[in-house]
Amino acid sequence: AIPRMLAEPAWQTFSFWIPLYLAKERGMDIAHIALFAWMPFLAADLGGLCGGYVSPFIARVFGVQLVRSRVIGVGLAAVLMIAPGCIGLVASPYWAIVFLCIGGFAHQTLSVLINTLSADCYPADEVGVANGFVSQAGWIGGLLFSLALGQFADTVGYGPLFGFLGVFDLIGAVILFTFIRHLIAAQEARDA
């Protein structure tokens, strides 16, 4: 639940703050926002599809168990989330859009993999509760970050806040690796 709590602020930031960010920080008018603001969501759709294929691909190519392949996929997506963390470092609004697209793709890939881990790690009669708890934690994280973003965007700007988004997913991946390590070891010992 903690990795999802740290990942969800990215999606809520993308969903609710991109147009305001593009207008205030990047000086885009409504016509330019309409031309570009949809792109991170298309990239997110592709990330959602990729999330379903990446772990079986990793398992097949590298010969690792499915749960380990999902965790590796989460790690790869978390590394890609560094891109939106660097938005404040680029001068061009078009590069900012590219970084938002990478972030949308990475977040949805990561989100699919974290949700799927609930089914991999819990008995069938507990999956719904586990996934509900993970989703609740995610939305709490998103709510808290949205409150902070609304409070601090005018004083510190969006750049540092986007930076936190990149760091949050890396921290979440490390926490996931730490807590799921024993489950992966037990699964691999059982299958050996």
Q: At which residue positions do the language-model features occur?
A:
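Extracytoplasmic gate region of multi-pass secondary transporters
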Residues: 1-51, 107, 111-115
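Cytoplasmic loop-to-transmembrane helix junctions
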Residues: 32, 66-69, 126-133
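Multi-pass alpha-helical transporter architecture, strongest
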Residues: 82-89, 166-192
